[in-house]
Amino acid sequence: MSQSTIHKIAVKKRTETGKNENNRLRSSGMIPVNIIGAGVATSGAVNEKELAKMVHSGIRQSTLIELDVEGQGQQKVFVKEIQRFPEIDRIRHVDFYKVVPGQKIVTKIGIETTGVAKGSKTGGQFEHIIHEIRVKTIPEDLLENLTIDVTDLDVGDSIKISQLKVPASWEILINGDPIVTSVNKTKALLAAERAEAKGAVPDDAKAKKGKK
């Protein structure tokens, strides 16, 4: 398991809003943001370069971010939405939502694997099917990624959602119990098994043939 990394960024409060003000902010190297929590939205602005660096570092919805808000101090948040200009790779606006300790939230958690499946060394094909899951949990138990060890997976083995080792507070929001990873027989391995089966002679048949 990979604990959620805390990223930090400063937020300058703003009282003026609207299209013209937002354009003025962007031309000065700042990006408008909203901080949402308890039904209240606070308008602010962050340094565009610092924000882009944080976003490009691979943050997810489950990444904990610490905002240093002008006049309000530090606030822990998650990213709710990142808006971009469609014609260029530039951030237009970001919505954050505040973390309330002990209050469950719904977010997405990535699934990573570690190790080399045993079955892939003997002709099997390893498959990583589900790369992300939706989870309802408390902020204190959030993970940026869930890492599963596939070293012991042999040909024909699989790991299902119900077999994942996760914090007790987690409720995985998914239908059924699908397979996350598996090691399947390749076409070559199946063909070899069929050929071997066709060429096999039962022991009693061999004995009868020897008596003739």
From Swiss-Prot:
The keyword rRNA-binding applies. Pfam families: Ribosomal_L25p (PF01386), Ribosomal_TL5_C (PF14693). Residues 13-24 have a biased composition (Basic and acidic residues). Residues 1-25 are annotated as: Disordered. Gene3D superfamilies: Ribosomal protein L25, beta domain, Ribosomal Protein L25, Chain P. Transmembrane segments: none annotated. One of its GO terms (cellular component) is cytosolic large ribosomal subunit. CDD domains: Ribosomal_L25_TL5_CTC. The keyword tRNA-binding does not apply. Keywords: Ribonucleoprotein, Ribosomal protein, RNA-binding, rRNA-binding. It comes from the Bacteria. One of its GO terms (molecular function) is 5S rRNA binding. One of its GO terms (biological process) is translation. Belongs to the bacterial ribosomal protein bL25 family. CTC subfamily. This is one of the proteins that binds to the 5S RNA in the ribosome where it forms part of the central protuberance. Part of the 50S ribosomal subunit; part of the 5S rRNA/L5/L18/L25 subcomplex. Contacts the 5S rRNA. Binds to the 5S rRNA independently of L5 and L18. This is Large ribosomal subunit protein bL25. It comes from Leptospira borgpetersenii serovar Hardjo-bovis (strain L550). The gene is rplY.
